[in-house]
């Protein structure tokens, strides 16, 4: 089985069709339920635009899957909540770390800072592909995990 089948079966929820839209909001077609798509997905979209198209965002309140170019998948920063920092209670000033937003990804140079209200900011040295809200970000100092949080 797949993720969407599991959710439909065990959460007993309806997964309504919605709209594919471009990054500027133009209607591109209908999708088969927002949970069937992941950020960075290219295959199986069921729409032809004459060029490679990727899922770059999911607008859940509007039930829209936003489609764009591969370049639209890259970001140089992220914010995280529910952060747990292992070696210290609070972050007094920005620190240099490495970070991962995907299990198979190599560690990426970044600066971690505290924004306030429980929100931390990660600024990457190089733009990162398909950073996804709701997924984990893990912070490292060399080979040692120094913390992590949820991408928002």
Label every model-predicted segment:
Residues 1-145, 150-152:
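Nucleotide-activated chemistry modules centered on ATP-dependent adenylation/adenylyltransferase
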């Amino acid at each position: 089985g797949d993720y969407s089948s599991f959710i439909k079966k065990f959460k007993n929820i309806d997964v309504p069709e919605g709209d594919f839209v471009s990054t500027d909001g133009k209607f591109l077609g209908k999708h088969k339920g927002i949970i069937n798509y992941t950020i960075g997905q290219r295959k199986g979209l069921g729409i032809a635009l004459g060029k490679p198209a990727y899922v770059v965002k999911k607008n859940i309140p509007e039930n829209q899957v936003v489609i764009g170019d591969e370049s639209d998948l890259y970001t140089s920063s992220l914010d995280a909540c529910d952060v747990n920092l292992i070696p210290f209670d609070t972050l007094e000033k920005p620190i240099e770390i490495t970070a991962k937003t995907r299990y198979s990804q190599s560690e990426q140079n970044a600066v971690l800072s505290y924004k306030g209200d429980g929100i931390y900011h990660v600024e990457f040295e190089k733009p990162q592909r398909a950073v996804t809200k709701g997924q984990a970000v893990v912070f490292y100092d060399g080979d040692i995990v120094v913390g992590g949080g949820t991408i928002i």
